[in-house]
């Protein structure tokens, strides 16, 4: 089997991808049997290509699933943890911009009664 092009995989449906994955795994099993029984060298070198193809198919499947989940949770209030932006732990714990801008009643009154003084410079 020749190497698979990923852009072709992206065009396929999930059922087609799962069928292809099953075929590739079956082929890999045959190649491993050939390796144990002392098969031809060209079959041994094919193992690497088939394993790569399996990885590519699995990657495309998982990417499609994640994309579908993102669409499903698009306008929801809460997101599953794996769909949230990674960031660092410290950044995730920080206050939001809104929380930082909030002021107590006392602060509001103080600013209202004692505003910043404005000075005009005579030239």
Swiss-Prot record:
NCBIfam families: L29 (TIGR00012). It holds the Pfam family Ribosomal_L29. GO terms for biological process: maturation of LSU-rRNA from tricistronic rRNA transcript (SSU-rRNA, 5.8S rRNA, LSU-rRNA); translation. GO terms for cellular component: cytosolic large ribosomal subunit. This is Large ribosomal subunit protein uL29. Keywords: Ribonucleoprotein, Ribosomal protein. HAMAP family: Ribosomal_uL29 (MF_00374). The gene is RPL35. Belongs to the universal ribosomal protein uL29 family. GO terms for molecular function: mRNA binding; structural constituent of ribosome. InterPro entries: Ribosomal_uL29, Ribosomal_uL29_euk, Ribosomal_uL29_sf. CDD domains: Ribosomal_L29_HIP. It comes from Euphorbia esula.
């Amino acid at each position: 089997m020749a190497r698979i092009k990923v852009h072709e995989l992206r065009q396929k449906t999930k059922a087609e991808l799962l069928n292809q994955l099953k075929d590739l795994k079956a082929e890999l099993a045959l190649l491993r049997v050939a390796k144990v029984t002392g098969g031809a060298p060209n079959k041994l070198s094919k193992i690497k290509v088939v394993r790569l193809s399996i990885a590519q198919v699995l990657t495309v499947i998982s990417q499609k699933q994640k994309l579908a989940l993102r669409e499903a949770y698009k306008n929801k209030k809460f997101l599953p943890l794996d769909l949230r932006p990674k960031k660092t732990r410290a950044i995730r714990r920080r206050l939001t911009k809104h929380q930082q801008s909030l002021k107590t009643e006392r602060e509001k009154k103080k600013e209202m009664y004692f505003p910043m003084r404005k000075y005009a410079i005579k030239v």
